[in-house]
A protein has these predicted regions:
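Class I SAM-dependent methyltransferase SAM/SAH-binding core
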Residues: 68-125, 149
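A short acidic, Gly/Pro-enriched loop at the edge of an enzyme's catalytic core
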Residues: 123-134
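A short SAM/SAH-binding and catalytic strip from SAM-dependent methyltransferases
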Residues: 133-148, 170
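Conserved catalytic/acceptor-binding region of the Class I
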Residues: 148-149, 155-235, 251
Length: 293
């Protein structure tokens, strides 16, 4: 990968900073997202469910010919890399995430051209009003504790005529591996099954609710919402189980009830029952939302 991933970020007032790997990282007071999750997320979940939708979002952003793009909830950089591949060098890309450990993983992988990585809280973006042409968020809105407030922040930093583009997952029934993982965990922990998947990543799919939150965030134009179906493939039934359980906050839910190994094996068994031992192929579905300021 290109060495262009190393560059200077000037810390904002009221933040702490440290120098590491040629980058000045902005730090908030939030607890760092640590441990093995970022690596597992990148190794298993990115190719399993995120790459196809990252390419889709990047195409939608590029079609608008933006000069400056803000990515929120960048994670380990799958959309960042897709944007870097399709946007001209003159287009500035600022990729942010709440968790520095995820951004460190993104920076370690690198991009094909210059990108600015910066820790930022979507609830209070550290950018001036009207400073970006496009704000893009891949599978992050579901995690915002106050969605209208976060969406209002995206509107604030958008220039007039700019666009917010984000995607969210469809329901569990339309995301077959995730549904199998949920069923496997319910069998393993019948008295108190982990509900993270259906509660958060796969719990924000209703179009009317999404449109209402966008409007509550101050957007006057109606939100355009389209459904995009893709396929999810892995070499073995164990790969989706590892990805969903050990590469997401679901890991903590499982650990609170028993061992991660027990949960992962139960999910693997359920995926095997439904799809065979591997290679496995399942349906995934997302909704893509576009709204202009």
């Amino acid at each position: 990968m290109s060495a262009t991933r190393k560059h200077l970020i000037v810390p904002a007032r009221g933040t702490r900073a440290y120098w590491r790997k040629g980058i000045i990282w902005r730090m908030a007071d939030d607890k760092a997202f640590t441990g093995s999750i970022p690596k597992v997320y990148e190794t298993y979940l990115v190719p399993l469910i995120f790459e196809a939708y990252a390419a889709d979002l990047a195409r939608r952003v590029a079609a608008r010919g933006p000069q400056r793009v803000l990515e929120i909830a960048a994670g380990t950089g799958v959309v960042t890399r897709a944007l870097a591949a399709v946007l001209p060098e003159a287009t500035e890309i600022v990729a942010t995430d709440l968790n520095p450990a995820m951004l460190e993983q993104a920076a370690a992988i690198g991009t094909s051209r210059r990108v600015e990585f910066q820790q930022a809280d979507a609830m209070q973006l550290p950018f001036p009003d009207q400073s970006f042409d496009v704000v893009v968020i891949q599978f992050g809105v579901m995690f915002f504790p106050d969605k209208p407030k976060a969406l209002a922040e995206t509107r604030r930093v958008l220039r007039s005529g700019g666009a917010l583009i984000f995607n969210v997952w469809g329901s569990l029934e339309h995301n077959e591996f995730a549904a199998a993982v949920q069923a496997g965990l319910a069998a393993a922990f019948p008295d108190d099954p982990p509900k993270f998947l259906e509660r958060t990543p796969y719990g924000y799919f209703d179009h009317a609710r999404i449109a209402a939150d966008v409007a509550a965030g101050g957007f006057v134009a109606p939100a355009e919402i389209v459904t995009v179906d893709e396929r999810s493939r892995a070499q073995s039934a164990g790969d989706p189980a590892i990805g969903y359980i050990q590469g997401s906050p679901l890991k903590g839910d499982v650990e609170a009830r028993g061992s991660v190994e027990t949960g992962t094996q139960a999910a693997t068994d359920e995926i095997t029952r439904r799809f065979g031992p591997g290679p496995v192929d399942g349906r995934i579905q997302a909704h893509v939302v576009t709204v202009e300021k």
